[in-house]
Structures are given as C-alpha cells and as structure tokens.
Amino acid sequence: MKHQVQHKLLSIRRKRKQINEQPELREIIADPIQSDEFWKDLFLVRPLENVEKGKALQLAWKVFCEFESPDYAPEGTEEFKKCLNDDAYLAGIRYYGAFDEEKLVGMLGIWEEKRHVCFFFVDGEYQRLGIGKLFKRMREDFSGRTITLNSSPCGLPFYKALGFTTTDSEQTVNGIRFTPMAYK
C-alpha cells in the first residue's frame, strides 16, 4: 500500500511538472472534460457512505470559507453555515466523494428528488486536477433527466464547460449570490 501511495504522489508530481514545462497543457486541464483524460485513474470517485457525510460537509465549509466567502456579505456566509447544520435542508441529499487514497478531496451533493446539485467543493490543492469527474459519475446515475444547480459567480465557467446552461440571471437570496443553471 505504501508503494501505491508513493507511486500516486509521483504520478501527480509528474503531471504537475508536465504542466509547468508545457504551458499548452494548461488549456487542456482548464477544460473539465479534457482534464478527465489527463488525470484519469489518480482519484477514486464513488458515492459516500452515511458515516462519511460529516467529513464531506466539513470539506464544503473549509472550501467555502477559502474561496467563496470572501465574495459574500456576512449574511451569505452565515446562511451557508446554517444550511450545513440544518437536518431538514440536508435531508434527501445523495453525496459523492473524490478520494486521493483515503483523503476526501472533493464532494458533490444532489437532492435526489429535485435533481438539484446543492454542493460541489474541491480542496484547494486538488482544484483543476480532474475532480470534475464527480459530475460525470453523478450524471451517469441521473442520466436522461434534467439536473439543476445554482452556480456561484466563480463557478460559472466550470459549469458551462460541463454543458450546463444558464436558465436565469444572477440572483442574491439571503446574501448568497448565484446563477440558476441546468444540464439536459
């Protein structure tokens, strides 16, 4: 197992070195679809067990505070924190995780009944490394059905690259800025 971990770390380091030495690769990995091929087999993507949901929500909060919260009014940050601790809000969500060995590095949550993605967060060290595979896995499970989400301002280019389209203009509700989107 130790050898596998070292091999995987070397693989990730090699890929990062390749990117630094070949700037044209940046365009490939900026595209979530093409980056899947580049980073394939480095991350395990699977549905989360009930006991793993707490870690997923902790990851969501950590990443939100690091990347999203600075663009929100305090009201928006408090609203998001409230959602993470609200059992009624969290009911009916199916969670998926991306793992680097045993470490949860990405999470996606979708309300099954509404087919609405309510969470998608990736640890900062792992962003732009193909964790968008979570969407591929989720789309397989919900194939043939429209999936919706509310994108943060910084997430719009990513979701558009995955094939989501905007369905309305940007809105702010309880301090949370978002643009409604759908994937058909």
Label every model-predicted segment.
Residues R94-G106:
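Conserved beta-hairpin
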